Structures are given as structure tokens and as C-alpha cells.
Amino acid sequence: MAGRALAVSNGEELTRLVVALAHQLGLEAKEQVKVARRIWGAERRIDVVLIHPASRKTLGLECKFQSVGGSAEEKIPATIKDIEAWPIPGLVVFAGPGFSDNMRGFLISTGKAVEFEELRPWLCLYFGLALD
């Protein structure tokens, strides 16, 4: 499976690998795109916005990495909910050994999350690119 050979060690690296994958697929990628404010006033930013250069179809990606179990996992449902307020479709891309099996199951069940190692085929289907 594409991506399996790439070991992700932190959140910044996950974002970098997502952007690199987008470029390999011929997509534009913009990082830390501001999209208004959250209800309590904090700026809402999307980690990565992908744009198909011909169709201009867009997709926002939140990149979540967790190396050990802990409270960061508890914030994921709020992230899934926050994506609903974006002006474009969105997805959580997650990686790391710190996500419990229950959280992995929850994320996948929402239809709004994908593990990094499964991102390439997901993006190909979403943007209408060749599956190779």
C-alpha cells in the first residue's frame, strides 16, 4: 500500500508528507489556510488545502499525529465536528502508534478520516485521478 514505507515521526512530518503526496499527484497544496474564527474567537486554520489545478475542486485536510496514548485523542471528535463548519469538504489524516484501536475505529467510521498510509487512493478517488 502506498505510504506504508514512510515512517511518520511527528505532526510536522505528517503535514510535510501530505503536501509531498499532493504534489506527486499533481495537486496544489496550501498550508495553514485561515478560514474565519471558531465560536470562542480563535482563528480557524486548515492544516492543508488541496486544489485540483484543472477542476479547482478543493479538499481541506487536518493532519493529526499521536506517538503515545493520551488526551490529544480526546480532541479528535471536536476536530471532526469543526470540519463541518469549513466552507469546503474536509478530512482528518491521522498517523502514529498513539491512537487506540477504538479511536482508529471511530475515525474511520465517521467517513471523515483516513490513515496516512491509505491517503493516496482516497485522494485519487476524490479528485478523479488514475489509481495506480
Predicted regions located by residue number:
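Acidic-basic catalytic patches of nuclease active cores, encompassing PD-(D/E)XK
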Residues: 1-37
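Short amphipathic alpha-helical segment that frequently serves as the phosphate-/nucleotide-binding helix
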Residues: 15-16, 43, 76-80
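Glycine-centered loop/turn motif at secondary-structure junctions
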Residues: 23-27, 87, 111
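Active-site metal-binding core of divalent-cation-utilizing nuclease and nuclease-like domains
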Residues: 28-55, 70
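Hydrophobic beta-strand scaffold residues
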Residues: 29, 90, 113-115
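Active-site-proximal loop/turn and secondary-structure-junction residues that shape catalytic pockets
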Residues: 35, 65, 120
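Catalytic cores of nucleic-acid endonucleases
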Residues: 58-59, 64-110
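Domain-level recognition of nuclease-like catalytic cores that cleave nucleotide substrates
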Residues: 94-132
